[in-house]
Amino acid sequence: MKFENTEVYGFKRALKGMRNPLESWHKNDTVEENGKVVIGENDLGLAQRLIKAGSEHRKFMRQIFVSVDITAPLYWWKEFDTYKVGTVANSCSTMHKIAEKEFALEDFSTEHLQDCECVSEDEFYEFPCGRRYTPMDSLVDTIKMLNKWRDLYINGVHCGGCLKIRQDKDIWWQMIQLLPSSYNQTRNVMLNYEVLANIYKSRKNHKLDEWREFCKWIEELPYSELIMSAGGLDDNSINAKLGAVRHLKKQI
């Protein structure tokens, strides 16, 4: 899973608008310096109080926007697509571009697939001839089959001495329905801090690695303590998370 080209914007306007109900704009102390936002003590304190007061009081969170390019397997995108409100996504199309390049093992998420070097007796299928067949073998054969159909789609197929039309839809269907859900797709995604808080609350301990990686990416965003607080973490847990992020950045 990859996160690229992360951009966060809207802090200054959102935190100024946060003060509209009480008309306390004179206390607004958030500034932009060299393209970076520095939230002042007054604004940060009010934001934290509004977050603790509940979602109906923290509307400013919906006005802080995040744009990012995410590469992840289709099985994760299927779950991500349940978040319809407050998200926009443009994806690389498997419908239109599935035959654009040859399929390779690197195009799939395979970190948990068992291979012959590490499987026990009950983790592979054995053919009558004695050949052992692991999940990784199955994916490799599927990739070979996908590339075979891709070649037929691009170059056409001879049938009864005649060249069947190239880019035939029947051939295209073979690739579409054979494509495993571990295939990685890239999307440009637009979210906001309120959506991220809801995701963080429900997914931070999810059994899918991709959701936990997503939540770690959230923790690295500017002023992510606002998201984590809205997501249900207490101050001690937030400080521990932020400390881990700072330590990681020092190592990098």
Language-model features: where?
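Family-specific signature for flavin-dependent thymidylate synthase
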Residues: 1-252
